[in-house]
Structure formats: structure tokens, C-alpha cells
Amino acid sequence: MQYRKQIGWWLMTGVIMIVIQVVLGGITRLTGSGLSITEWKPILGSIPPMNEADWNHAFDLYKTATGQYKYLNADFTLSDFKFIYFWEWLHRNWARFIGVVFLLPFAWFWYKKAFTPEMVPKLIALFVLGIAQGLIGWIMVKSGLTDDNLYVSHIRLAIHFVSALVLLAFTWWFAMDVMIPSSARQSNPSYHRWVTFILGLLLLQLVYGAFMAGLKAASAASTWPDINGSYFPEALKHQNWVNHPIVVHFVHRTLAYVLFAAIIFLSIQSAKMGGSVLWKKWRFFPMILVFIQVLLGIGSVLMATETQRNGFGAFEWAAQIHQIVAMFLVMALLFHLYLVRDQKS
């Protein structure tokens, strides 16, 4: 197919841009910037305040629409507000830019009749997932635009994060399907099932990672290997597996240990397998990433009492890199899942 390589690189550009968007989302959350823009204007919202009067109006909206200002940021100056506004504005505008980078080449490829029939439903799904992600983001922000909440709902935050990862995973899989020759793939049903199981565990872990972020649960137990002096904290008796910071923290740590062991086992199995040069080059990448991820998680917990309000210190850096490595781990495992099929075809 004449345009297959170009379509593949177009999709890979989308993958890179989605990764950047998730990073920007993490920075927006860590700097406390997510509630700074209190309106949702998909088109006109791309234009920031252009003069002092516009800035004061935007600041007044933030003051009146959020409990966050009243109870947490009442000492803010206009300069402070401009800092948090910038990150939320950049996060939203990068999403708009992704839309442009999707639609313009799509129109050109469509005009050139470059798409195969099996690509069309996938492209429609990509478009729907992208639009849905924008809507989910606004629904999340709305949960924080009240007099009672300092932050957005941690449950809606988790939905927003996981839906972004679904979009990333779908685009990444689509790109691999276009770019990787079938000769690079092999069949091993048991290995394929094991990777699928680990991805399921990782999805649950990522949900709890978002809960950790939304509930500020790292600072609720800034100790390791124990959790505030106990390995099985009293809070487990509450059996609130979604809303209690200590319980969420316990689940996130426990899943990390299980995933670490599972991926080490996966790497031992991959070492016994032959395969293409591509496979041999990247088969141990999940193991490397999970080692880094565990260290980052421990470091983030131990530094969680040193958070900077509306700033970026050591904890914020560790937490942000922790999120980035999580995305790479998802992509690495999907790469394994793609290269090692469930059956011959």
C-alpha cells in the first residue's frame, strides 16, 4: 500500500502527542491548576485573556466559582493566578492541537484514498474516543467548581486518566498494526494470556494510582515499607476501598508488589523464547520499567510531605515521572501482546 508508512508515522505522531497531553495533565494537577478556567468553550476557549481587564475577569470567575480559592488560595495574587491558568490553558490547547493534527492529515489521506477498508472503523473510533476524552475532562473539572470541594472528584479524575490511556493504547495498537510486519510476530498462547492478565492488573493499579493522586493519599502515609507503622493499617476495617486515603494507599502498594512479581516472572518466560530481532531487542523492557516504577513510587511516597502548593518540587517531579513510566509500561506490555499472538494467523 502506497501510503502505509506515512499513515503509520501519522499515528505515531498521535501517540507522542497523547503522551505529552497526559504529562501536561499531570503537571496541571500537581500544580493545582485544573480549576483555574471555569468555563468550557471548545473553540473560543483557545484564546487566553488578552489584557488586564480580561485577566481580572477570569480571576474573578475563579474566585466566585471555586471553594479552592476561598479555602486554599485566598492569598493568591493575579500573578499566581496567571501561573495556574497557563497550565490549564496549555493542557486544553494541546488537546485542540491534537485534533488538528488528526483531522488535517486524515482529510488528505481520505482524498488520496490511502485508507484500507479495515482502517476506517478504527479511525472513526479514534475520533469518538478523542471527543469523549474532552467531554470527560470537562465533567471532571465541573466536580471541583463548587463551594464545598477543594479539588476535582478523584473518581472522575480516574475516569479521565484511564480514558486517556485507552485512547493512547488504541492509537499505539493501531500504529503497530500499520508499521510492524507480520513476520516480526510469533504465536505463544500461554505467554499472550499472561500478558493479558498483567495488563488487567495494571489497569486496576492505574485506577488506584489516580485515586492516590486525587485523594492526596501519598501524604497520608509518607513511610515505607510500613504504612504509618503498620503493614495492615486499622483503616482496612472500614472496608471503603474507593474513598479512604489509607485504604487506597494500601491497595496501590499491594498491587505494585503483585505486578512487580508478575512482570519478573513474565521476563523469565520471555528469556526462554526465540523470535524476531525486534522481539529480542525489547523483550526485557517491561522488567526494566517496573524496577524504575517501584523505585519512583517509593521515592514519591517518602517525599510526599514536601509538596509545594502551586509549584513544582522534588515530590512533584517524582510523581510526574512515575506517571510517565506508567504510560511506557502500558505501551511496553501492549507491544509484547502484539508481537506474541494468541494463535497462528
Q: Model features per residue range: what roles?
A:
Residues 110-124, 189, 268-286:
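Membrane-interface helix-loop-helix junctions at transmembrane boundaries of multi-pass membrane enzymes
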Residues 242-249, 253, 310-335:
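Membrane-interface transmembrane-helix boundary segments in multi-pass integral membrane proteins
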Residues 206-253, 258, 268-271:
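Membrane-interfacial catalytic/cofactor-binding modules of polytopic membrane enzymes
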Residues 28-39, 135-157, 213-222, 294-327:
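Interfacial helix-loop-helix junctions of multi-pass membrane proteins
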Residues 9-46, 200-213:
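N-terminal signal-anchor transmembrane alpha helix
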Residues 98-104, 161-178, 258-265, 324-340:
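Hydrophobic cores of alpha-helical transmembrane segments in multi-pass inner/ER membrane proteins
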Residues 13, 17-21, 121-141, 197-205, ...:
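Small-polar-interrupted transmembrane alpha-helices in polytopic inner-membrane proteins
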Residues 61-100, 242-259:
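Individual transmembrane alpha-helix segments
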